[in-house]
Amino acid sequence: MYKNEEIMQFVNLVAEVVAPDRIILFGSYAYGTPNEKSDLDLLVIKNGKDFSVDDEAKLSTAVYLKRKQRNIRTRYDVFIQTDRQVRMSAENGGAFVDAMQKGKVVYERTNQETGFYNI
C-alpha cells in the first residue's frame, strides 16, 4: 500500500506533466479501503477543448515516461477529462459519478500556495 507521501509524489508528477485545473483521487485510497492490490485512481480535469482518445493517450504516455524517469513505482489509472466531459458522464450515470461524489480533491490550480491539499 502507498503512503500519503508516495501518493502526493505521483499527484505532483501528474500536475507537472498535465498542468490540470483539478485532480481528484477516487477509489479505495480516497475511501480509506486500500489493500495490497490497490492502485491509485485519479480523475484529472483540464479545461479547454474536449480530449479525444488520442489526446488522453499522449498525456498518459507522458505521465508514464516521467514516472519511469523518476523511478516512481506507483500503479495507477489516470483519466484526463474536461469539466464538460465529466459533467456529461455524470449526467448519464457514467464512470465519474463515484469520483465526483466521493473522491478527494488533491490538487486545484486556484489554491494560491502550492495547489496541493492534504489527503
Predicted regions span which residues?
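Catalytic core of pol beta-like nucleotidyltransferases
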Residues: 1-22, 31-36, 46-119
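Conserved H-loop
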Residues: 28
